[in-house]
């Protein structure tokens, strides 16, 4: 793993087609967007205080390889993964970043396919707060690091692979966001994923997005 931050962003700014899915809500209005096929959870502790659970919906019909990687790292089924790792980079009103379970500083991590794997596609965008995307060190360098958006960073579209959306636990995400950080955007208090895993999705459901 080459040195340097996995997520390359300007300092001033700080980074097979999935089937068209539509469904009708209780009002009868058809919802259009990607379908959640899988869910994972992160139980988070800040310092010595358990602050709650983040639940992330994943879009396996759009980015199946990226989702497979994320789920396997959440469950630890390959013998390594997110459990015990930290959110090592936090920038208020922008994003929180985690997933470096080897170096814990943004220079490490690995995928289930090897050290890195290529960008799958950029069909999903950074639509707003709570979207989950792969951190990288340039094109085709996805590993295990990811970030959760705290704004609508459209300048990252086409550069980072979006694969999920926070469905529950944004209060936990904001608790991490509000932590004091050092000069390298690292929280002064460890924000740890103390447990992680998969939640079964019996019936896929749509997350509505514009222009889908």
Swiss-Prot record:
Pfam families from the UniProt entry: Pro_isomerase
EC primary class: isomerase
CDD domains: cyclophilin_ABH_like
Catalytic activity line of the entry: [protein]-peptidylproline (omega=180) = [protein]-peptidylproline (omega=0)
SUPFAM superfamilies tied to this protein: Cyclophilin-like (SSF50891)
Cystine residue pairs: none
GO biological process, one term: protein folding
Keyword set, alphabetical order: Cytoplasm, Isomerase, Rotamase
Residue intervals of the PPIase cyclophilin-type domain: 41-198
Gene Ontology cellular-component annotations: cytoplasm
GO molecular function terms noted in the UniProt entry: peptidyl-prolyl cis-trans isomerase activity
Notes on how activity is controlled: Inhibited by cyclosporin A (CsA).
Keyword Cytoplasm: yes
InterPro entries associated with the record: Cyclophilin-like_dom_sf, Cyclophilin-type_PPIase_CS, Cyclophilin-type_PPIase_dom
Tissue: Specifically expressed in kidney.
Compartment(s) where it occurs, according to its Swiss-Prot or TrEMBL record: Cytoplasm
Keyword Cytoplasm recorded: yes
Enzyme Commission number(s): 5.2.1.8
Described function: PPIase that catalyzes the cis-trans isomerization of proline imidic peptide bonds in oligopeptides and may therefore assist protein folding.
Family: Belongs to the cyclophilin-type PPIase family.
Protein known as: Peptidyl-prolyl cis-trans isomerase C
The gene coding this protein: Ppic
């Amino acid at each position: 793993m080459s040195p340097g931050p996995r997520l390359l962003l300007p300092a001033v700014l700080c980074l097979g087609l999935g089937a068209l899915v539509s469904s009708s809500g209780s009002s009868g209005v058809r919802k259009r967007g990607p379908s959640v096929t899988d869910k994972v959870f992160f139980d988070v502790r800040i310092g010595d205080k358990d602050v709650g659970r983040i639940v992330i919906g994943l879009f396996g019909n759009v980015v199946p390889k990226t989702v497979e990687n994320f789920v396997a790292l959440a469950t630890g089924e390959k013998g390594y993964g997110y459990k015990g790792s930290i959110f090592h980079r936090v920038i208020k009103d922008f994003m929180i970043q985690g997933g470096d379970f080897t170096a814990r500083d943004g220079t490490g991590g690995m995928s289930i396919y090897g050290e890195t794997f290529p960008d799958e596609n950029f069909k999903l965008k950074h639509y707003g707060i709570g979207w989950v995307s792969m951190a990288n060190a340039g094109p085709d360098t996805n590993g295990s690091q990811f970030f959760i958006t705290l704004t609508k960073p459209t300048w990252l579209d086409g550069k980072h692979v979006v694969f999920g959306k926070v469905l529950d636990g944004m209060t936990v995400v904001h608790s991490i966001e509000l932590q004091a950080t050092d000069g390298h955007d690292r929280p002064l208090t460890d924000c740890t994923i103390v447990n992680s895993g998969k939640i079964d999705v019996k019936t896929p459901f749509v997350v509505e997005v514009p222009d889908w």
